[in-house]
Amino acid sequence: MLRSSIAPGRQLLSNPVRQRIPSQWLSRAGASNRLAGQVKRTISPSFLFLYTHNRHAQRFFADSKPPTTGGPTPVSPSSESSVPPETISKAAEQESKLPPSPPAAAPRKSGRFRRFLIYLILTSGFAYGGSIFLALKFDNFHDFFTEYIPYGEESVLYFEERDFYRRFPNALRHPNRLPAAPREEGKPVTIPSKSGLSWKVAEEQKADADSKKAEAAHEGQIKPAAAKPEERNAAVVKAKEDTASKHSTKEAKPESEAKSPVSLDEPRKPAVSASTIELLQLQDGDDTVVQDLVKTFNDIVTVISADENSNKYSAPVAKAKGELEKIAEKIAAIRSEARNTAQEELNKLHATFDESARELMRQFEEVRSTDLASFREEFEAEREKLALAYQQKVNTELRHAQELAEQRLQNELVEQAIELNRKYVHEVKSLVEREREGRLSKLTELTADVNELEKLTAGWSDVIDANLKTQQLQVALDAVRTVVERAETPRPFIRELVAVKELAAGDAVVEAAIASINPTAYQRGIPSTTQIFERFRRVASEVRKASLLPEDAGVASHAASLVLSKVMFKKDALSEGDDVESVLVRTENLLQQGDVDAAAREMNTLQGWAKILSKDWLGDVRKVLEVRQALEVIEAEARLQCLRVE
């Protein structure tokens, strides 16, 4: 399980981090302790004296030089001096007892593979645990995890069992203890004497007893679905009377039977027959499954009634009868609810289809108002075809319903014939098989009708989606036009243009129209017609001042042109000519009429300083015209797409 797979990972995670470093420290500490012990054991007093003497005799550069005295200098050894052998042996022993030099430290390993392995195990563990959590939360991921991941099913089962035991802690304490059934207080049942097993071999019973038992069993085996209500009531009344008479005779002669001696040679008397239990009858049990269940239950009741100890089964049989009646009522309620739900869904679908058809016709009438006369006949013909198709479909459904009702009645008659004529079972089975094949063929036809309806629904859905997309594109165009024409100041319309582009995704005409717009136009906005007209007035005054300037004018020419522009007479709007004043007057008149395109064309005919001064104004007007032209192209494309929908 999951524990067996996670335990090695935990050991790998715990061993290198928790055990390696202390072991290294302990090994190093042990080595240092051993080295210290060896040094302590090998250092002699003479070595300590020499070490301390040399340490005290050592002088650093920062220390002051000790003053030299006139003391005697040590005598240097001469070649003639002799060394005693005891000193040489002691020095050799001291040198041999010195500890060896510590080994060089091994190069430290980088541990990249170990870190990679640790990170890989951690990542795998977290991913596996997260996958188990997702498998417990989501059914789709549960199927994928348990089918394709190793040990996935065992892990999920383990955690599900833990969750179950956490929710139900008492489930393990009494796993086999069942809740005690309520004790039914019924009538006391008296078991007649000698009704059980005995040591004596059973002898042949009398012929009349056998005939009575066979007749009773045969009458009890008749099912309620085959017999009529009057016959079933008569059988029940007869069984009750026989039971009452048998009980009275049994109560009247208990003492005589007890006093009379039992003879082993005479044949045994047949057991007293028990009372007949009433068969189950359902008023609304027209379902095949319910009828089969009632037949099976009545067969069981008949067998129990034929037994001599049927009284002790009366209470459970009555309880089971009540449960079966409740089940039959629930099945009838569920069938009626399902039938009502299906009818409501069918009505909703019809209403939706009718509403969609009306909406589509209304849109077609709005778009094709100019061609209403030519297409009216086709529209009427299509509507008649649809009505005829719906009428044929309704007639087909009614015919199918009638055939199903007739088939149900025929099946009931066949079942009754089966119950009355058991010797023709084989022929009845063949008939049922043929009827089953007929049902399968009708199911195939119904499936074909459903597929055709799905295709029709998909077609209507495509038409509705296309019209909805066209309406959304038109709304987006209106939003862009509102931002462009009704804004008091130039506003960027990037979001509106992006919405138009997303709605017309895949349309080359719309994308080309949007690409033709200058980026600065939708990033900074474009002026409205009023702003263009106001700016034209300011530009016109500057152009009039420079209208008399030649191309190579100087300061004097500028001053003269400024003075003469004040005394120039304005011309009429209908005046013709290529001079600056005539062009400005015609442009102003066109702007007042709202014809920005013609006004821009007039201003574009200027030359020299007048054209240079009006260059910025012409650039803004060009951006406005580009945006308007693009919007007109997109709107025309949207209308064309709407006309293409069939």
From Swiss-Prot:
<feature type="region of interest" description="Disordered">
    <location>
        <begin position="173"/>
        <end position="269"/>
    </location>
</feature>
<protein>
    <recommendedName>
        <fullName>MICOS complex subunit mic60</fullName>
    </recommendedName>
</protein>
<feature type="topological domain" description="Mitochondrial intermembrane">
    <location>
        <begin position="137"/>
        <end position="646"/>
    </location>
</feature>
<dbReference type="GO" id="GO:0061617">
    <property type="term" value="C:MICOS complex"/>
</dbReference>
<feature type="topological domain" description="Mitochondrial matrix">
    <location>
        <begin position="62"/>
        <end position="115"/>
    </location>
</feature>
<keyword id="KW-0999">Mitochondrion inner membrane</keyword>
<keyword id="KW-0175">Coiled coil</keyword>
<dbReference type="GO" id="GO:0042407">
    <property type="term" value="P:cristae formation"/>
</dbReference>
<keyword id="KW-0809">Transit peptide</keyword>
<feature type="region of interest" description="Disordered">
    <location>
        <begin position="61"/>
        <end position="108"/>
    </location>
</feature>
<feature type="compositionally biased region" description="Basic and acidic residues">
    <location>
        <begin position="228"/>
        <end position="258"/>
    </location>
</feature>
<feature type="transmembrane region" description="Helical">
    <location>
        <begin position="116"/>
        <end position="136"/>
    </location>
</feature>
<dbReference type="InterPro" id="IPR019133">
    <property type="entry name" value="MIC60"/>
</dbReference>
<comment type="similarity">
    <text>Belongs to the MICOS complex subunit Mic60 family.</text>
</comment>
<feature type="compositionally biased region" description="Basic and acidic residues">
    <location>
        <begin position="201"/>
        <end position="221"/>
    </location>
</feature>
<keyword id="KW-0472">Membrane</keyword>
<comment type="subunit">
    <text>Component of the mitochondrial contact site and cristae organizing system (MICOS) complex.</text>
</comment>
<feature type="compositionally biased region" description="Low complexity">
    <location>
        <begin position="66"/>
        <end position="87"/>
    </location>
</feature>
<keyword id="KW-1133">Transmembrane helix</keyword>
<dbReference type="Pfam" id="PF09731">
    <property type="entry name" value="Mitofilin"/>
</dbReference>
<feature type="transit peptide" description="Mitochondrion">
    <location>
        <begin position="1"/>
        <end position="61"/>
    </location>
</feature>
<feature type="coiled-coil region">
    <location>
        <begin position="317"/>
        <end position="455"/>
    </location>
</feature>
<comment type="function">
    <text>Component of the MICOS complex, a large protein complex of the mitochondrial inner membrane that plays crucial roles in the maintenance of crista junctions, inner membrane architecture, and formation of contact sites to the outer membrane. Plays a role in keeping cristae membranes connected to the inner boundary membrane. Also promotes protein import via the mitochondrial intermembrane space assembly (MIA) pathway.</text>
</comment>
<keyword id="KW-0812">Transmembrane</keyword>
<keyword id="KW-0496">Mitochondrion</keyword>
